[in-house]
């Protein structure tokens, strides 16, 4: 219950709030209102209400806004700067009365009900969803305002937005993410400690219980450790991005003046206090004094640290602490401030995008979890280059083909060409060029054009008529002149020159088949044909980094070989070349009919590309931003896969359409980025998993018949295991691996087979580091997890120096297994030798240490008095060999000097089993060794639930 002072304060605040609600509001929230002051003055983010609850009412539905007469708003039309936009829409909030505004006004921002800054942000958004906290924007429509409204309300709002945005560029929003995750808040610290005390209080210990993790001998311990590590990480809740939020888990002692905050996490000091008092009572000693109790209680506290962090000092397991804090450090590397995240991601989008608005409190205290590291896609692409290339090219083609264009009619293009050539004797050649014009395949040629500028190794082909005509020459010329050199193979280049030579010199392919490129170029120049070169396109640096290419510059080839600085073709003499062609005498005729027709065609294509290249350049850059640099460098198509018909080629450039990438289409490209990013992330994760699988399951492959057979068997086992329930891989990878017609199983098998022997780096992300850390501890500290690599069997009559710190009767634990006992060396026998021994009576009578195997053990610690024993005899002797049964101890405390139990201990046992003391056991008197620190980041932090940054083209 709150104290009187708190109740009075709360009552006063409620009175203030009710007074504020009676006011008449002109805007959604006024800076000088009592509510605004309350919002500004909340002080202690740790304070709660009586029950810590958040209460606010959804209210009654009412009209969200009404549009009033536009003429009521003054409009600047006569100033030095004239505003050409339609007068803005004014929202009349007077007519809303207080229905919606009361919700915002009554939102519980009283300091006593605010838990932390996250709570404040949640309440701000909750209020905003049912009232107008922000006036409808003029350019950006925030969709979060739509919650709970009716279709009629939506019609009015959209009508207002449309009216406001007339004569203004419309806006589109989309989400851009870079490996972002929602952080899991861990509210309490897992300590995994159990305090065990004998019935009479004489003995007590603290045990860290992480569960039993049985291992198998003959199977790689590293691999088993990895499996257990994943399970343990999941059990501890650290396998996903998390943040510790335990700074408010404390209480204060009101019985005396004390400002300390006593932590409620971990093993309770009260339990330790009770155990110590029981132990003191057994020895007839007084209980802990008040001062000693306070000292013990103060061993588990919460205190503030730098940057507003809270340090919780608690009693917890040493292994739990090591694993938890390591995992915390790994995930925290990727937790950054919201503003830093915005700056990072702003570099990855076009300059004309801007981040959406966040609350001021989010900018001040906001944090985001993001992964900066990126896994490589090359292990998949290198091994499946043809399939991966085919997949992505076919994925891009339909999208690019659908780009809106402002097409020029073929009739107008034909008329222009006829007017340029003029003379009647040129008409047949003009007709040959114009009659074959078509736009049927323009969209696919346009898509191929974009792909040639997007990829370094995208090659195109073209097959000409066996008896070339003027259209073939026009198409070949367009290919050499307007397509980047890297997209034209040497064979295709020579073929283009041959086609030109055959037509322009009026010869046949047989005559020029053996001519080299240089010979062909010389022939054409001598004939008066100057267009014989391929041209290296200008590489343009992108203003943003491509997806999954952090910190890297993305590049693409500027379309049509236009230099973006001069806005002209990279061939400086292109202005003169048509004039040279026009006067040429081709095909061994006396007139220039062929030259004039081709010159007019070239001028039209030159002018078209010079006028329209910008739209294509923007289109290329937008799609190129979807492609990681490593795919830009590596993807390549097979020869002949993307051939262009000469008719389509000459038609495309002659009637080149202007790109009309409107807001809707650009928005489609923007939204595709999220799909591509998610797909890349999925593939990278699966590649990393597959590499880990290969490295774990297959060692270096020796080229011997036995090893190859063993490798094949192991591969079959792996495939059958990972495809037993459902495929380990996603639909995307299945599509890539099955392009050549194989099944998913066979495709994955073939790929894994290719990965064996390659030293591809494994993408090390936080969860991999965490699993590796747990695996290493699992191997190094085996006794924590219930297995050991050596045990000792001794006859009952031999006295063994045991670990007596815990007060067990006939303890099976030794600080370390002795190498000598009573001056005699203890025999060591490997498990494999022991299993084949014919007679073990002698070794048992002398005692021995068994090693070279993994021995699983479990134990129950009984609080009553008794004789420590094994659940059953562990030695198994048969005609075929010897073995060790599962080891399970029943361990009893020695609570008193019991003669009967002492005799039972000596008389009924032939041999005893000893192991090294499990490191998870701690005597009660050493309880301070269980004290560990955990750091909770400042409770003033606000973790952005949806960290995707929305960008708006304005």
Swiss-Prot record:
User: Where is this protein localized, as stated in its record?
Assistant: Virion
Which stretches does UniProt call biased (Polar residues)?
16-29
The annotated region (Disordered) lies at 1-29
Q: Which UniProt keywords are given for this protein, alphabetically ordered?
A: Capsid protein, Inner capsid protein, Virion
- Does the record's keyword annotation contain Translocase? no
Q: Which InterPro entries match?
A: Seadorna_VP2
**Keyword Iron on entry:** no
The record's GO CC annotations read: viral inner capsid
In which residue ranges is the amino acid composition biased (Basic and acidic residues)?
A: 1-15
Q: What does this protein do?
A: Self-assembles to form an icosahedral capsid with a pseudo T=2 symmetry, about 60 nm in diameter, and consisting of 120 VP2 subunits.
The family database entries (NCBIfam families) matched by this protein are listed as:
seadorna_VP2
Q: What is this protein called?
A: Major inner capsid protein VP2
The record lists the organism as Banna virus (BAV)
The organism's taxonomy opens as:
Viruses, Riboviria, Orthornavirae, Duplornaviricota, Resentoviricetes
Q: Gene name, please?
A: Segment-2
């Amino acid at each position: 219950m709150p104290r009187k002072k708190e109740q009075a304060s709360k009552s006063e605040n409620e009175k203030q709030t009710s007074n504020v609600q009676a006011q008449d509001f002109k805007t959604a929230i006024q800076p000088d209102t009592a509510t605004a002051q309350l919002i500004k003055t909340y002080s202690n983010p740790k304070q709660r209400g009586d029950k810590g609850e958040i209460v606010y009412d959804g209210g009654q539905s009412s009209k969200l806004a009404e549009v009033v007469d536009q003429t009521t708003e003054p409009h600047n039309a006569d100033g030095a700067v004239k505003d050409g936009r339609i007068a803005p829409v004014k929202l009349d909030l007077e007519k809303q009365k207080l229905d919606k505004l009361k919700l915002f006004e009554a939102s519980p921002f009283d300091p006593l009900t605010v838990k932390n800054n996250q709570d404040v942000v949640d309440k701000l958004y909750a209020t905003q969803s049912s009232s107008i906290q922000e006036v409808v924007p003029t350019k950006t429509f925030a969709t979060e305002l739509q919650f709970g409204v009716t279709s009629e309300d939506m019609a009015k709002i959209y009508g207002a937005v449309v009216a406001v945005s007339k004569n203004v560029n419309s806006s589109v929003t989309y989400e851009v993410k870079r490996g972002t995750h929602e952080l899991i808040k861990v509210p309490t610290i897992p300590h995994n400690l159990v305090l065990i005390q004998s019935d009479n209080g004489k003995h007590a210990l603290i045990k860290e219980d992480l569960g039993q993790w049985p291992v198998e001998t003959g199977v790689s311990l590293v691999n088993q450790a990895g499996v257990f590590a994943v399970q343990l990480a999941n059990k501890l809740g650290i396998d996903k991005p998390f943040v510790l939020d335990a700074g408010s888990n404390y209480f204060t002692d009101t019985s005396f003046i004390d400002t300390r905050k006593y932590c409620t996490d971990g093993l309770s000091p009260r339990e330790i206090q009770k155990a110590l008092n029981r132990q003191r009572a057994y020895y007839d000693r007084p209980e802990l004094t008040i001062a000693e109790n306070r000292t013990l209680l103060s061993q588990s506290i919460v205190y503030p640290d730098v940057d507003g962090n809270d340090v919780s000092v608690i009693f917890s397991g040493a292994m739990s602490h090591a694993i938890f804090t390591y995992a915390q450090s790994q995930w925290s590397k990727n937790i950054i401030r919201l503003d830093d995240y915005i700056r990072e991601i702003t570099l990855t989008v076009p300059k004309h995008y801007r981040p959406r608005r966040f609350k001021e409190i989010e900018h001040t205290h906001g944090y985001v979890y993001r992964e900066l590291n990126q896994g490589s896609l090359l292990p998949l692409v290198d091994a499946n280059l043809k399939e991966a290339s085919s997949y992505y090219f076919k994925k891009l083609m339909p999208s690019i083909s659908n780009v809106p264009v402002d097409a020029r009619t073929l009739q107008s293009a034909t008329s222009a060409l006829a007017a340029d050539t003029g003379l009647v004797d040129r008409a047949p050649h003009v007709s040959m060029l114009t009659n074959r014009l078509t736009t049927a395949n323009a969209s696919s040629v346009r898509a191929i054009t974009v792909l040639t500028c997007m990829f370094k190794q995208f090659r195109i082909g073209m097959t000409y008529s066996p008896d070339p005509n003027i259209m073939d020459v026009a198409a070949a010329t367009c290919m050499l002149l307007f397509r980047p050199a890297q997209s034209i193979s040497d064979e295709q280049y020579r073929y283009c020159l041959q086609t030109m030579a055959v037509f322009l010199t009026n010869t046949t392919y047989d005559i020029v088949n053996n001519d080299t490129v240089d010979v062909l170029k010389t022939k054409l120049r001598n004939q008066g044909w100057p267009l014989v070169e391929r041209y290296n396109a200008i590489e343009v640096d992108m203003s943003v980094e491509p997806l999954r290419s952090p910190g890297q510059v993305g590049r693409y080839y500027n379309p049509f070989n236009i230099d973006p600085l001069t806005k002209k073709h990279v061939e400086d003499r292109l202005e003169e070349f048509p004039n040279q062609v026009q006067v040429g005498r081709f095909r061994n005729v006396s007139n220039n009919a062929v030259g004039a027709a081709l010159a007019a065609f070239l001028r039209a294509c030159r002018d078209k590309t010079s006028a329209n290249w910008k739209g294509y350049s923007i289109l290329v850059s937008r799609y190129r931003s979807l492609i990681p640099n490593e795919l830009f460098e590596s993807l390549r198509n097979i020869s002949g896969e993307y051939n262009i018909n000469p008719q389509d080629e000459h038609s495309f450039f002659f009637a080149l359409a202007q790109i009309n990438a409107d807001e809707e289409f650009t928005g489609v490209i923007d939204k595709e980025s999220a799909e591509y990013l998610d797909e890349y992330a999925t593939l990278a994760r699966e590649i990393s998993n597959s590499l880990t699988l290969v490295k774990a399951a297959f060692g270096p492959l020796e080229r011997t018949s036995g090893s190859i057979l063993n490798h094949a068997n192991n591969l079959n086992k792996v495939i059958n295991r990972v495809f037993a329930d459902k495929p380990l891989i996603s639909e995307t990878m299945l599509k890539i691996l099955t392009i050549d017609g194989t099944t998913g199983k066979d495709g994955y098998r073939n790929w894994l087979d290719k990965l064996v022997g390659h030293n591809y780096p494994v993408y090390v992300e936080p969860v991999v580091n965490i699993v590796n850390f747990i695996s290493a501890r699992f191997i190094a500290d085996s006794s924590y997890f219930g297995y050991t690599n050596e045990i000792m069997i001794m006859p009952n009559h031999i006295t063994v120096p045991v670990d007596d710190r815990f007060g067990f009767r006939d303890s099976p634990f030794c600080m370390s297994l002795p190498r000598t006992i009573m001056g005699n060396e203890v025999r060591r026998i490997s498990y494999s030798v022991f299993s084949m021994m014919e007679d073990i009576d002698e070794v048992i009578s002398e005692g021995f240490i068994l090693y070279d195997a993994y021995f699983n053990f479990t134990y129950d610690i009984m609080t009553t008095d008794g004789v420590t024993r094994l659940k059953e005899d562990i030695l198994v002797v048969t005609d075929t060999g010897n073995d060790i049964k599962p080891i399970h101890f029943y361990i009893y405390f020695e609570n008193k000097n019991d003669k009967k139990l002492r005799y039972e201990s000596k008389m009924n046992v032939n041999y005893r089993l000893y192991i090294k003391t499990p490191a998870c056991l701690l005597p009660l008197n050493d309880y301070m060794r269980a004290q560990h620190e955990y750091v909770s980041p400042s409770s003033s932090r606000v973790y952005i639930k949806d960290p995707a940054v929305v960008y708006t083209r304005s």
